[in-house]
Regions:
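Small-molecule kinase domains that catalyze NTP-dependent phosphoryl transfer to phosphate-bearing small molecules
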Residues: 76-123, 129-133
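Glycine-rich phosphate-binding loop used to anchor ATP phosphates in small-molecule kinases
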Residues: 6-54
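Conserved phosphate-donor/acceptor-positioning beta-strand/loop module used by diverse small-molecule
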Residues: 52-74
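Hydrophobic anchor at the start of a short beta-strand
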Residues: 28, 58, 107
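Conserved beta-strand segments of the P-loop GTPase G domain that flank and frequently precede/overlap
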Residues: 31-32, 61-64, 109-111
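Arginine/glycine-rich "motif VI" loop of SF2 helicases in the C-terminal RecA-like domain
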Residues: 50-56, 79-84
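P-loop NTPase switch/communication element
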Residues: 1
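Conserved nucleotide-binding/hydrolysis micro-motifs of P-loop NTPases
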Residues: 34-35, 64-69, 114-115
Length: 133
């Protein structure tokens, strides 16, 4: 239902809010997977070019996580939105592409497979984003 009826509208709204926020601040973070868009040829480059027109720079943060860690976190989260995914894990996971996308300028890799990797990636992310200014 979500994929067919809500997703595209939700993502359009997220992008509109982000563009509006850029009018008031120089840094805007969007926390959405964009898993389809990140692999659509030209989508990220077109977005990058659109943002450059308003003086903004696109940085894509790709969160890496082991598949089993994802499953365990869904179990621990105990959310209704994960019920189908967990009950149909093999079918669900076949649809997810965990490989790092190719050809994206300003791609920051964030490893979230363990507490240690998360802390290290967080420190690196803070340094990375501070250096963009």
């Amino acid at each position: 239902f979500f994929e067919e009826n809500i997703r595209n509208y939700e993502y359009d709204a997220i992008m509109e809010v982000a563009r509006e926020a850029l009018e008031y601040n120089d840094t805007v973070f969007i926390n959405s997977p964009f898993t389809r868009e990140v692999r659509t040829p030209g989508y990220m480059e077109n977005l990058r070019q659109d943002l450059l027109k308003i003086g903004a720079e696109l940085v894509v943060v790709w969160v890496q996580c082991d598949v089993e860690v994802c499953r365990q976190r869904m179990i621990a989260r105990n959310s209704d939105r994960d019920t189908w995914k967990l009950e149909n894990w093999d079918e669900y996971i076949k649809k997810i592409n965990f490989t790092v996308p190719d050809g994206i300028k300003n791609l920051f890799l964030f490893n979230n497979s363990s507490d240690e990797a998360f802390k290290k990636s967080l420190d690196e992310a803070v340094k990375y984003f501070k250096n963009l200014k």
